[in-house]
């Protein structure tokens, strides 16, 4: 049995998609990779990403322009609206999120309020704003860190309610929410959460989570409640059903569904890489998410983004040494962009790299653009000996054929590698 390891560098984009400026015109200039390399204040040491072909996909003076390794390198469009970690990972694993509903909470206040009251909760508007206060302290609101209308949050102070209570409220919201994700968030803040409410883009209103202190005060608890999906038609479940061991690492352990998977949740990059390396020593599928790049993007901290990228690169060097059997695969990609120089703290809608190390291949292949992150999951399925048709979405590169379970994204391009 072979090993396939997918490493998702959260927020690592390689240039704006054509529709990146629909919400914020300035986002057409987004280029997370290039701007981190340009503005980090020093030359970043990224030998593994260079060997994996990042410089072929995104030419830059700071990246190697050739590689001796048998890699396939390209980039992928996101394949879902907006720029969101949850939607990105679900799409990557084979879900079709292309028609996910984008909606502000203001458009569904009556439905959400009625559901919460029916569940026995006290519900009020906060000073007439389109935001709900539940049981006097828990806020149901637009998520201000993603593109408007992609996600809603249910946020509470752990000084006021247990996380189980906050999560229960979020589950009730999820029953009527049309959006991709309802996120239950519990943390510690020194003042009532109403003190940190602000307006966001496109008339959204919500908790300013970074300002609340949730991220810096410790004890943060988060659970993502996604739109209803057939998880049996996603890569982790497909692999597990075939008897292939599955390990989910970092944020992937929190947002992907697979009852049989070993879960290794972690935020520190050193822990994510250690768990990934440990799991990669055994046959099976490993999906790992490095979250700290995304956090640096939200903080608009270019230097921190570069530091984390170097940490990731060091881990990738170890994985390249480890995954040396003919059918092993290391796939490095992203889920969206998060350009720390763009002038705001939101994700950016960018292409992401798709860098595949395949020890059995004869040389380097430059891949055409994939139309969706679902193609990454379909390609990983093929490398594990699985039929990508078992996924709900995605086009796999494969030997002498292309397997499509959704629209063909490559406009008849020949298969780029065996």
Question: Where would I find each of the regions flagged by the language model?
Answer:
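Feature captures the catalytic ectodomains and active-site-proximal regions of enzymes
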Residues: 1-418
């Amino acid at each position: 049995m072979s090993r396939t390891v997918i490493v998702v560098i959260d927020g690592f984009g390689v240039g704006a998609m054509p529709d990146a400026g629909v919400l914020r015109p300035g986002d057409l200039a987004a280029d997370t990779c290039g701007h981190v390399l340009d503005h980090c204040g020093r030359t970043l040491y990224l030998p593994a990403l260079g060997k994996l072909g990042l410089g072929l996909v995104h030419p830059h003076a700071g990246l190697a322009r050739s590689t001796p390794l048998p890699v396939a390198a390209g980039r992928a469009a996101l394949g879902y609206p907006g720029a969101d970690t949850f939607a990105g990972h679900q799409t990557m694993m084979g879900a079709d999120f292309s028609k996910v509903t984008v909606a502000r909470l203001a458009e569904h206040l009556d439905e959400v309020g009625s559901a919460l009251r029916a569940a026995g909760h006290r519900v009020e508007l906060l000073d007439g704003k389109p935001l709900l206060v539940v049981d006097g302290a828990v806020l149901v609101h637009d998520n201000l860190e993603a593109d408007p209308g992609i996600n809603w949050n249910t946020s509470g102070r752990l000084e006021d309610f247990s996380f189980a209570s906050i999560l229960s409220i979020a589950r009730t919201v999820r029953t009527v929410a049309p959006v991709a994700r309802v996120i239950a968030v519990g943390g510690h803040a020194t003042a009532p959460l109403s003190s940190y409410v602000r307006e966001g883009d496109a008339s959204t209103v919500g908790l300013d989570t970074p300002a609340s202190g949730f991220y810096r005060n410790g004890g943060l608890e988060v659970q993502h409640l996604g739109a209803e999906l057939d998880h049996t038609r996603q890569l982790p479940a497909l692999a597990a059903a075939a008897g292939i061991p599955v390990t989910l690492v970092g944020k992937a352990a929190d947002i992907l569904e697979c009852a049989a998977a070993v879960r290794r949740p972690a935020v520190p990059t050193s822990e994510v890489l250690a768990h990934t390396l440990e799991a990669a020593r055994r046959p099976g599928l490993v999906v790992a998410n490095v979250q700290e790049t995304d956090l640096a993007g939200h903080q608009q901290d270019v230097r921190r983004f570069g530091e984390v990228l170097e940490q990731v690169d060091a881990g990738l060097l170890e994985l390249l040494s480890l995954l040396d059997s003919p059918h092993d695969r290391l796939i490095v990609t992203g889920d969206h962009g998060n350009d720390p120089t763009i002038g705001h703290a939101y994700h950016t809608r960018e292409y992401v790299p798709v860098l595949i190390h395949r020890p059995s291949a004869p040389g380097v292949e430059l891949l055409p653009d994939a139309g969706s992150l679902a193609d990454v999951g379909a390609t990983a399925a093929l490398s594990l000996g699985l039929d990508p048709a078992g996924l709900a979405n995605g086009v796999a590169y494969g030997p002498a054929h292309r397997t499509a379970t959704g629209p063909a994204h490559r406009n008849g391009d020949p298969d780029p590698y065996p």
